[in-house]
Amino acid sequence: MPTSIKKSRNEFDKSPRRYRGSSGDQRRNERYEQLLSAGLSVIGSQGYAAASVRSICAEAGLTERYFYESFANREALLAEVYKTQTRFLKDRMLAAFEKSERNSAAFSRAGLQAFFDTLHQNPDVARLLLFEILGVSDTIDLLYYEAMEEFAVLIRTLTESLDLADISGIPNQDMIYAGLVGAVLQIARRWALTNYREPVSSVVESGLFLFSAATNYTANNTP
């Protein structure tokens, strides 16, 4: 066989195989996204404890072998679904911050509005972020606390960089921002447990009170 033909055949054999116009990597990515979506749906409607690999695969329309192609176990899926949805929430908040007026009240209101709107409009996301992520394992607990710390750092960074509020007189500012994030989450949990009885505007005002109180405390206690 001529060398040129051998070379062409070898190059062809090394190229990604395609099926119905998609490469193997593309199909794996599609299955991965299907499983993430199915995981959110099943966990959001049934709870993590009841979310079996079989039920997630049934929701995704895939066999179990494809589940283990992407995830080692249910907990690994939970972690990826959680990280995906925290990014989704953070992106919604950042977009709101970008559009808000550059003052402390408007900035806080915009972020809180985006946060509570997202939970209200996406009950599966709310159940995952507020309840189902808790108490699963030490590894998942660490993931949860890391995410909460990231939100606290985000708010502090944006607040300071835009000079929206000055709480420099408080000895441990990190504690304050972490506390604000935790308090807003608890408001959200209570709201969800009452089946979102209060209107979004009312819940936003409750959260805004906490941020205003932190700012006012510093203003009133600065020499």
Regions found by a protein language model. Give the residues of each.
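N-terminal intrinsically disordered/low-complexity leader segments
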Residues: 1-30, 166, 219-223
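Short, amphipathic alpha-helix enriched in basic
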Residues: 22, 28-55
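Alpha-helical DNA-contacting segments of helix-turn-helix folds
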Residues: 26-30, 71, 76-85, 92, ...
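Helix-turn-helix
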Residues: 42-76, 80
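Hydrophobic alpha-helical connector segments
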Residues: 80, 95-121
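Amphipathic alpha-helical segments used for helix-helix packing
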Residues: 121-139, 156-159, 189
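Hydrophobic/aromatic-rich alpha-helical bundle segments in the mid-to-C-terminal region
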Residues: 130, 162-210, 218-223
